[in-house]
Amino acid sequence: TGNDLGGSLRTPAAFNGVVGLRPSPGRVPRGTRLPSTDTLWVEGPMARNVDDLALMLDAGVGHQVDDPLSFDHSGPSFVKVLKQVETPKRVAFSPDLSVVSMEKEIAEVCRSAIRVFKDIGTEVTDEIPDFDGVLGAFQTLRAVLFAIMMEPILEQHRDMIAPEIVG
């Protein structure tokens, strides 16, 4: 397992041919090292494949008394649900979400992969939400979180910390 604030589980997984999942806040308890009100930073699994990831998620979910955002998992096992998944009727696709730049060749590989969805009868749309301002909002929220967590370090060594971290 690991944690994810802005892609720390998902990005390395994507680069290494494994699966990383950022669960909903509170799904996997975080312990006490983070402010109890923070919902940006979550714990989650990384695994070789989706089946293993579901198994890890089953093992990691649940309420933990020292994490007030955590909650009991009263639903069925993720492994069980995975075996009952139906073919999606509609999916949206965007190689870059209009947020990051992408090499043309990589975008083409991604576009060719969406044929799998079309071949199983899924409607594929390219509707992209308006993400204007999202990066700035994320960086502000991240700076506040880091300022809370690292107050003593910030007071003594602010000049040594990257500006995009401290805002």
Question: Model segments located where?
Answer:
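Short glycine/serine-rich loop segments
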Residues: 1-64
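Short low-complexity, flexible loop/linker segments enriched in glycine and/or proline
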Residues: 14-17, 138-143
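Electropositive phosphate-/nucleotide-binding environments in soluble metabolic enzymes
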Residues: 18, 47-51, 104-107, 111, ...
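Generic secondary-structure signature for well-ordered alpha-helical cores
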Residues: 23-26, 33, 51, 55-66, ...
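Gly/Ser-rich, acidic/histidine-flanked active-site/gating loops
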Residues: 40-42, 65-140
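Short helix-loop capping/hinge segments that flank enzyme active sites or metal/cofactor-binding pockets
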Residues: 80-94, 143-167
